[in-house]
Amino acid sequence: MMYSRFRTVAGNLNCAAKRLSSSSTTTTTTSAPSELQQNLAALRARLAMESPSLSDFISLKSDNAYSVEVGTKKKPLPKPKWMKESIPGGEKYVQIKKKLRELKLHTVCEEAKCPNLGECWSGGETGTATATIMILGDTCTRGCRFCNVKTSRTPPPPDPDEPTNVAEAIASWGLDYVVITSVDRDDLPDQGSGHFTETVQKLKALKPSMLIEALVPDFRGNAECVEKVSKSGLDVFAHNIETVEELQSAVRDHRANFKQSLDVLMMAKEYAPAGTLTKTSIMLGCGETPDQIVKTMEKVRAAGVDVMTFGQHMRPSKRHMPVSEYITPEAFEKYQTLGMEMGFRYVASGPMVRSSYKAGEFYIKSMIDSDRAASS
């Protein structure tokens, strides 16, 4: 059976991973909604019956085929060659940085020290410069162990002029696709959903043709907040699960959890207009096992998510969660292959891929344009 072979492949991945422990950490989870269970069962049945072979999914036999060790605290090993960061530069990079400073706008690109900042801001291969704008201030109410954004229980109140400033700035840059994200604002009655909605609506009013991806927090699972943002006019509703189900409490803030994030993605699919894509992202190299990754992918796909991205966890400072291992480009490629077999419409997977990834945005834009052309 295909699914049996599929599981064998995941088992082989586990054997290839050098830093996997003999007993993985598990957590007790709440039973998933019946709809999710039905979707998961249907996905597994389809994988068991389909004919395309997955024998090439993972055949990583050498010691370094799946990952490379990071060394010890006293004797760290150098990063592998594929993790070398490019230096930011170029005329467009300078222009965007200057404009952001003038308008006092924040980008997650800088706050989170994204390794792709140079490529995205300078235009990269597609020639279109992009920046992921962070609204609701630069201070988060949560403290996830992987994130470099500063935190506070009582951050400054949101700037009431920010939605207008952000919309006008982005509209003037001549972009076709933009990502708007935010810090968590548990201190606000509506978790910041109203501010998010206003920003999207103002930008769409100024430039209706622009495609907008909203990378949102979980709003503590509040359905009204999710519905409000889902119906704001966005084209892609994104919310990141960040890591496998078993490592949620070790990686994310205690107010976040796997089920809550899946529920948010499912609600967005229900509330958003037809044709709106849902998207999520996961980091590798946090101590997860390949089998846990596969199971997480199954549940995400069963929740109706259209797009999934995989990237390497990179420690922003010594006070943050350490990297457990560097996953090889070959292993990332295999996860992409499996994701497409599962039925995701698009999967971006690579060491330097982040949830707001320029190449992925370019592909998603093409996909949305194609969908709309076909339906017109």
Swiss-Prot record:
Known PROSITE patterns for this protein?
RADICAL_SAM
Task: Report the catalytic activity.
Answer: [[Fe-S] cluster scaffold protein carrying a second [4Fe-4S](2+) cluster] + N(6)-octanoyl-L-lysyl-[protein] + 2 oxidized [2Fe-2S]-[ferredoxin] + 2 S-adenosyl-L-methionine + 4 H(+) = [[Fe-S] cluster scaffold protein] + N(6)-[(R)-dihydrolipoyl]-L-lysyl-[protein] + 4 Fe(3+) + 2 hydrogen sulfide + 2 5'-deoxyadenosine + 2 L-methionine + 2 reduced [2Fe-2S]-[ferredoxin]
Q: Which Gene3D superfamilies match?
A: Aldolase class I (3.20.20.70)
Compartments it resides in: Mitochondrion
The EC code for this enzyme is 2.8.1.8
Listed cofactors: [4Fe-4S] cluster
Cofactor, how bound (note): Binds 2 [4Fe-4S] clusters per subunit. One cluster is coordinated with 3 cysteines and an exchangeable S-adenosyl-L-methionine.
Pathway entry: Protein modification; protein lipoylation via endogenous pathway; protein N(6)-(lipoyl)lysine from octanoyl-[acyl-carrier-protein]: step 2/2
- Record keyword Plastid present: no
Cellular component terms (Gene Ontology): mitochondrion
Residues bound to [4Fe-4S] cluster 1 are C109, C114, C120, S356
Tell me if Coiled coil is a UniProt keyword of this record: no
The superkingdom of the source organism is Eukaryota
Binding sites annotated in the UniProt record for [4Fe-4S] cluster 2: C140, C144, C147
**Taking the first listed entry, what is the main subcellular location of this protein, grouped into a coarse class?**
mitochondrion
Residues forming the Radical SAM core domain are 125-345
Molecular function, one GO term: metal ion binding
Which InterPro entries did the record assign? Answer: Aldolase_TIM, Elp3/MiaA/NifB-like_rSAM, LIAS_N, Lipoyl_synth, Lipoyl_synth_mt, rSAM
| UniProt keywords, alphabetically | 4Fe-4S, Iron, Iron-sulfur, Metal-binding, Mitochondrion, S-adenosyl-L-methionine, Transferase
What else is noted? Answer: This protein may be expected to contain an N-terminal transit peptide but none has been predicted.
Annotated family:
Belongs to the radical SAM superfamily. Lipoyl synthase family.
The protein, known as: Lipoyl synthase 2, mitochondrial
Annotated gene: LIP1-2
